[in-house]
Amino acid sequence: MQRFWYGATVLNVIDGDTIDLMIDLGFDIHHKIRVRLYGVNTPESRTKDLAEKEMGLKAKSFTKDWLTNHKWVFVNTIPDKNDKYGRILARIYSSDDVENTTTACLNKDIIQSGYAREYFGVGDKTWAEFKKETK
């Protein structure tokens, strides 16, 4: 399976697992996309459940900080994969040097930080169920 890599500029962080990006397609062609972090689920930041909302805002803050603290951002798209809302599924990598050597992966880092969990779209559990399992 061939994957595609694009340089990107962050436009907006929607929540912990969704980002608006301007991707560089080359030849001075740019395209705005909404990306869902592949394999990642964060709590909702727009919910009436106050505990989940608090965690969702922390996850969003983590994502913003991660993107701000890395100089170069790259998108590794998952071919022919969109979520049910039409968002592109992708892994987000960063590099801190001009050689574009990837040094970190947002998808992995947000899960390891405890602000997200792995998710591949099947048998999703609520955050309350997930929290009980991790205690």
Describe each PLM feature range.
Residues 1-135:
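Small beta-barrel nucleic-acid-binding modules, primarily SNase/OB-fold domains
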